[in-house]
Every structure is written in structure tokens, then in C-alpha cells.
Amino acid sequence: MPQVGDMLTGNERQASVFRRADTVIKPYVFETFLGRYQTQLAVTATERCACFRFRFPQESARRILLQPLVGASWFQVSGNRLEGFTRGNSGGVPPGFACYIYAEVDADISGSSLFSGEQSFHGESESEQVGVALELAQGGEVSFRVATSFVSIDQARRNFDAEVKGRSFEALRDQSQAIWDERLGRIQIEGATQIQRETFYSCLYRTQLFPRIWHEPDEGGQPIHYSPYDGEVHKGVLYADNGFWDTHRTVYSLLSLIDPERLSEMIEGWTNAAKEGGWFPKWSSPGYRACMIGTHLDAVVADAYVKGCRDFDVEAAYAAMLRDATEVGNAEGSFGRTGIEAFEQLGYVPADEFDHAASRTMDHAYTDYCVAQVASGIGRQEDARRFYGRALNYRNTFDPKTKFARGRNRDGSFVEPFNEFRINSSYEFHI
């Protein structure tokens, strides 16, 4: 956050208005004018770094504020360089997690201080929700380049050198624009109105935001990653931040058509996750997350496999799929299929023991079909027959009287009362 005048900290005290008319929002750049500080702000990004450009007024004191949202932080300033880390997170990480930063300002830093809330102080100790203020010796145009890493400060510096060091804001912006033009240009549409084109390409843009690249290049340029699944640094790729319960039937099917190489790399990353944590993630955020039902990464793998996207460890991926289909996960539901033992025994997930029972039954049946598809492809015919058979368990939710899929109790009875117009009643819907 750029700031001019007296130092103000705390979200409400330091906030500035900006006008839509003064704002440019593109996939590759954000620009606006901060009226309170009479400062033009622009930011562009690379895969692991960002470059901010501030155009300050010449008069008055001016500074850059950097503040993590939550968690303990530590910062150190030396010359025009800043390094540090924050442990802030919203879950899905092991103990010791940190996001490391390395940054440089292309202007002299006349002083620095730490702050928390509205209190300013000096020191280097790790503290909760601590930010850093960099006082700048001159106004005019200033560039602030920031690199991130989940491995270490040294790795953040390596990312800085590889992606933004010595490069102007304009060069980085143009590079980002070229990347986005290429990605969005992979699909050309004809006969659309301008509004339809804007809607289509805005939606296509959003399909490219997640999952996020989690791996980083080591000193030899080979991918490494900090694993949120076991807290260690490993060789290889990793992706993060995506739930599969809806994207398995939308985003990943699209990627299989317009970016099959990247899709294979994503699956290799989640196969690495299974090697490190023991299970495929149900929702990667960035590690295991108990959110939504089913193990739909199984469907992502099967869809890619049958379409020929197989540049990943297929045997290891299949082993993770097989574990999803046959073993009990944890009680929180962050991995494994909830109710899988009852599903195997009864042919459905009983509604008097598990929530979303009809949906779980159909999810498990569908992903059994996906397991069978891969099993058949790699020559595991006995497995294929087993899971093709279990895939028919979806029929056990169908009530011939009401013509709806419904939750069933362990004794075989359908849950009563039945109301097809109420979500999460005895009528369970599934798309």
C-alpha cells in the first residue's frame, strides 16, 4: 500500500478511495489512482512475483506499507532490500508453514519501522500481524518488486532473480499480456456480439486462475515444492487451491482439450501429493481440506487418461484412486470417501448414519466407474469388473414411487417425510 503524509496503519485508517473511471483492470495489470494519497498505483505479476509501480507526488513524506492479513510475521530491511515471512494461513497446512518474501525498491529507503494495528515500533522479533513501513527518500516513480516462496527466503530471492530482477514494469506487464493473449487465444469464437464475447472470454479467463502453481525452480532450474501434505521440501511439481466436486466436470474437461500438457502436469502434482500425504486431496487448499463430498479427483484422472493425457505416474495415480475406493479416510472427511464401508456392504450410503447420503451414493458410484476406466486401461481387469459392478449402486437411491433419487436408511427404507422442493430434506439432488 503506498502512502503519503502522516503514517496511518490499520485498515480503516489507511484506506483510500478510488474511482472506477480511474481504474484499469486487465488479466495482466491493475491500475488506479488513490485519491487520498494523490498516488498512481499499478501492479503486474509473474508466476511467483509481482511488480508494483507507484507514482508519488514530490512533496510530503511517502512510504510503502506491507502487511500480512493474519498470523505471525517477521521482516528485516537492509539497504533497499526487504526479506521476511508470514505464517498467516486459513488452514490446510502443517505446523511450520510460512510464505517467504524477498523484495527490492528502486529508490533509497530513508527509514523503516514495524507496526501492528495502530502501533508503530522497531525490532526484528516474530510477532502476530506485524507489518513493515518503508520510508522513501524521494517521490516520483518508484518500482517495488516482490518475490514469494513457500520453501525459504533464499528460494524467494532465487525466484526474484529469475522472474523480475532488472526488468522494468512495462516489460513485465507486456510479458504477462503476451501470456494471457496466448492462453485466451486458444479458443476463437465467431458470430458473437461484443457482450457475448466479453462474457465468454471473462469466463475462460476465470478457468485459468486455479489450480495455482505451487512448485518453484531450484538452483538448477528443476521443480521443487514445499509440501503442505507432510511439511517437507520435495522434488517435482505440485498444484494447489482447487476443489474437484464441481470442476471435475467443467474446468478439467476443458483443459483436456485446450491444455493437455498442463493437465498431465497437474495430475502429476496431485499424485505427488498422494505420495507425500498418503491420499489424493478432496479439496486442495493448499493441503488436505474437509470440504464438499466425494473423491472427484478420481474423475479428473480418468477423464485425462481416456483422452490420452497420460504424462504422469499412472500407476501411482491409480494406487491413490484405489485407496479412495477401498479404504476408510479420516473422520473429518478431508480425504477418503465418507461412508465407503457401508457403501460396499449395502450398496448405498445410509442416510440415518451419514449426511448427504443419496449424493454420496451417486458420487461413489460415479467415481467407481472412473476407477474402472483406468483399471481397464492398465490391464487390471479384475479391478475393472469389481468397480464397474459397484458403479451400478446409483440405482439403489432411486425410488420408483416418486421417481426421485432419495436417501435410504440402513434398514432399506426411504427417509420420510419426502419433499422434492426442499434442499437437504429426504430428497437429495445431484447434477
Please provide the spans of the model-predicted regions:
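Long, well-ordered core segments of solenoidal/helical folds
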Residues: 211, 259-279, 316-333, 341-349, ...
